[in-house]
Design a protein with these regions (language model features):
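Bacterial Sec-dependent N-terminal signal peptides
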Residues: 1-24, 257
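Acidic beta-to-alpha connecting loop that harbors the catalytic carboxylate
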Residues: 133
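Short, functionally critical alpha-helical segments immediately adjacent to catalytic or ligand/cofactor-binding
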Residues: 130
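N-terminal, motif-rich segments that launch catalysis or mediate targeting to/interaction with membranes
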Residues: 18-127, 136, 141-257
Length: 257
């Protein structure tokens, strides 16, 4: 965990808002997870993905958004429910949500009767959705669409609260996904990793939801965010990326055990 403190002290002065976690965040999660797969899980996943890495396929669920044929999967990326409540007590959407998505993907992958094509598709989705689960604004409020309607400035560029957490904070650190994943992975020992892998999807979602409440209270509409915001919250961003990677590995190892 000492690495997170070092990150704060080393934040660069150059930021980027080009990425649409965003791509980097999802790739970091996939890269970390790949390091902690069992031999059996790695073999099964390698076969399904034709040798491609988890980092490579981690953005697939966002890429298919441009195709109307996949429009029904859009609600699978998130869930919005009232702050201060638990997911299991909240009303559920008839169109599905991220929890239903993860359960569906898991069931398809565990089902011996699922086609190879279905398994490949749902594995790619699962890698992405476990990442989304750890981005707090994917567990935000309905009223502002998980922070998308809260307009802000990131340094001198227009943005919104959702994008700040999707990509602005990550891109601000200006590291490639492999480099960042390696640093985040090496800063956690085996005992800490096992602790972070405790719980289930419901626990992890409610944890993100609690962080969302803190994030909402951290800004005002139209506020200009910069160095001080990055200094205060990059630790949470990095921690969530770590958890996402370790927990993705746990989910995949359980599926392919």
């Amino acid at each position: 965990m000492r690495f997170l403190l070092i990150l704060f002290l080393a934040l660069p002065t150059i930021c980027s808002a080009n990425a649409i976690w965003g791509k980097t965040g999802h790739r970091v999660t996939g890269q970390i997870a790949e390091k902690h797969l069992t031999r059996k899980a790695k073999k099964a996943i390698n076969k399904l993905l034709d040798g491609h890495s988890l980092a490579f396929v981690s953005t697939y669920a966002d890429e298919i958004k441009s195709d109307r044929a996949y429009s029904s999967y859009s609600p699978w990326h998130y869930v919005n429910y009232a702050l201060g409540t638990r997911y299991q007590d909240a009303p559920k959407s008839e169109f599905g949500d991220i929890v239903m998505a993860i359960e569906t993907c898991t069931n398809v992958l565990k089902n011996p009767n699922s086609s190879q094509e279905d398994k490949i598709f749902h594995l790619k989705l699962l890698v992405h959705f476990i990442g989304d689960l750890h981005q707090p604004m994917h567990a935000g409020r309905s009223a502002d669409k998980g922070g998308n309607d809260i307009q802000l400035q990131w340094f001198d560029q227009g943005t919104n609260l959702h994008r700040v957490w999707d990509s602005n904070l990550i891109d601000y650190y200006n590291m490639g996904y492999v480099e960042l994943a390696n640093e985040l992975d090496r800063s956690i020992d085996k005992k800490e990793r096992k602790q972070l892998q405790q719980g289930d999807v419901y626990d992890w979602l409610d944890e993100s939801h609690e962080f969302a409440a803190t994030i909402y209270s951290s800004v005002e509409v139209g506020e200009k965010l910069g160095y001080s915001y990055a200094y205060e919250y990059n630790g949470l961003v990095f921690s969530q990326l770590q958890k996402g990677g370790f927990r993705l590995a746990k989910v995949l190892n359980d599926i392919f055990s």
